[in-house]
Swiss-Prot record:
Domain FAD-binding FR-type: 11-123
Annotated protein name in UniProt: NADH-cytochrome b5 reductase 3
Subunit structure, as described in the record: Component of a complex composed of cytochrome b5, NADH-cytochrome b5 reductase (CYB5R3) and MTARC2. Interacts with MTLN; the interaction is required to maintain cellular lipid composition and leads to stimulation of mitochondrial respiratory complex I activity.
Cellular localisation: Endoplasmic reticulum membrane; Mitochondrion outer membrane
Substrates-to-products reaction catalysed: 2 Fe(III)-[cytochrome b5] + NADH = 2 Fe(II)-[cytochrome b5] + NAD(+) + H(+)
């Protein structure tokens, strides 16, 4: 029998209950929300995200998240969230509204989920359906390799796609991930990524760059640049799809111009 889908209608908000909260590190948490029954799945195609909405200080706040669980998981959905605490980022003294709200939630509290949302769906075996915009029908792109550039929390949609590819032994798509963070301790989901790399080294290539590198650091330092793209993403000759997710300035100033210099045409670049 097909499992019941939680997100039946993308226009309806579904309240889900917090059932577990795990401290991953100083500012990262894993939140587990119960689906309506133990037999339910979330119903989120690979490549799509959900929106959380909550009334915070009298205002409706809505933020996109990509779960780290999948439709293989019944009865729950997991989100890994970086909490932006107030008074820790000079530019954002108030911190992150939604992440601090999640941090303040108690077991048994509910929050509203809505989705699926997004312009890309991974259909398996190298096949991506991408809508140029909300009104268009999807264009199918089939590739042998995928380049991925993620910044900070932008890793979550990449992990979702990587996991979908790696879990199918008949999917021979090769993923090359370049993952940028401020410091080594900011690397979100590092254990999960390294486990995947160790299990699937032929199909999953992983490279980090950090703004501030520790003394003995085996990877790159600094912003994403042309050299990193040349060295750690598939070559343009393979006609890969290049996926990006991260802060808008990273995509606009670090990714797109350098991808173009290396020879990756805009038509094959997609930003989540």
């Amino acid at each position: 029998s097909t499992p019941a889908i939680t997100l039946e209608n993308p226009d309806i908000k579904y309240p889900l209950r917090l059932i577990d909260k795990e401290v991953v590190n100083h500012d990262t948490r894993r939140f587990r929300f119960a689906l309506p029954s133990p037999e339910h799945i979330l119903g989120l195609p690979v490549g799509q995200h959900i929106y959380l909405s909550a009334r915070i200080d009298g205002n409706l706040v809505i933020r996109p998240y990509t779960p780290v669980s999948s439709d293989d998981d019944k009865g729950f959905v997991d989100l890994v969230i970086k909490v932006y605490f107030k008074d820790t980022h000079p530019k954002f003294p108030a911190g992150g509204k939604m992440s601090q709200y999640l941090e303040s939630m108690k077991i048994g509290d509910t929050i509203e989920f809505r989705g699926p949302n997004g312009l890309l769906v991974y259909q398996g075996k190298g096949k991506f359906a991408i809508r140029p915009d909300k009104k268009s029908s999807p264009v199918i792109k089939t590739v042998k390799s995928v380049g991925m550039i993620a910044g900070g929390t932008g890793i979550t949609p990449m992990l979702q796609v990587i996991r979908a590819i790696m879990k199918d032994p008949d999917d021979h798509t090769v993923c090359h991930l370049l993952f940028a963070n401020q410091t080594e301790k900011d690397i979100l989901l590092r254990p999960e990524l390294e486990e995947l790399r160790n299990e699937h080294s032929a199909r999953f290539k992983l490279w980090y760059t950090v703004d501030r590198a520790p003394e003995a650091w085996d990877y790159s330092q600094g912003f994403v640049n042309e050299e990193m793209i040349r060295d750690h993403l598939p070559p343009p000759e393979e006609e890969p799809l290049v996926l990006m997710c991260g802060p808008p300035p990273m995509i606009q100033y670090a990714c797109l111009p350098n991808l173009e210099r290396v020879g990756h045409p805009k038509e094959r670049c997609f930003a989540f």
